[in-house]
Amino acid sequence: MVDVLGGRRLVTREGTVVEAEVALQNKVVALYFAAGRCSPSRDFTPLLCDFYTELVSEARRPAPFEVVFVSADGSAEEMLDFMRELHGSWLALPFHDPYRHELKKRYEITAIPKLVVIKQNGAVITNKGRKQIRERGLACFQNWVEAADVFQNFSG
C-alpha cells in the first residue's frame, strides 16, 4: 500500500468508493495532477488513458499499476466531467479531500499536467512520467517496476 494514501478513500469515474490500501496494494502508483480546463492536461490524458488501458485493462496479465488522479479543477463538477470525458478506469482522490493540497505541496507541483510515479513508501521514482510516456511509451513501465523494488518479477 502506498503510505502517502494510507487511510484514504478513492473514487472511480462512476462514483464507486474504494479503500486506497486495497486498490493500491503491490502496485506502482502514478499520481496524476491535472485539470479539465487545462489544454495540456486535455492533450496528455488520452495518451495516459491508452498507456493505462494497454498495461492494465487489455493486458493478458494486468500490470501492477494504478493511476490516482489529483484534481486541480475548480469544482467537483468540473472534476467529474473531466473524468467521465477523458479518463481511463483509474482512481481519484475525492475533490473535497483537503489532502489534494498536501500532495501538491509534498511533490512540488507547480504546473499541470504532472505525472509523479511513486514507490510504496511515497518516494519518487520519477516526476517526469508524462515526458517518459510521450518519449518511450510502454517501455518506461519496466524501469518504474524495477525502481519500485517490490515488483522485480514483472515482465510486460
Swiss-Prot record:
Function: May be involved in the maintenance of both the function and the viability of sensory neurons, including photoreceptors and olfactory neurons. In the retina, isoform 1 may be required for rod function and isoform 2 for cone viability and function.
Protein name, entry field: Nucleoredoxin-like protein 2
Expressed in which tissues: Both isoforms are expressed in retina, in the photoreceptor layer, and throughout the olfactory sensory neuron layer of the nasal epithelium, in neurons. Also expressed at low levels in brain and testis.
Pfam families given in the database record: Thioredoxin_8
GO biological process: photoreceptor cell maintenance; sensory perception of smell; visual perception
Domain Thioredoxin as annotated: residue spans: 9-147
InterPro entries: RdCVF2, Thioredoxin-like_fold, Thioredoxin-like_sf
Summary of the knockout phenotype: At 10 months of age, mutant animals show signs of photoreceptor dysfunction. The progressive loss of cone function is followed by cone cell death, while in rods, the outer segment length id reduced, but not rod cell death is not observed. At 12 months, mice present a stronger age-dependent impairment of fine odor discrimination than their wild-type counterparts.
PANTHER family, per database record: NUCLEOREDOXIN-LIKE PROTEIN 2 (PTHR46762:SF1)
Domain of life of the organism encoding this protein: Eukaryota
Family indicated by similarity: Belongs to the nucleoredoxin family.
Gene that this polypeptide is encoded by: Nxnl2
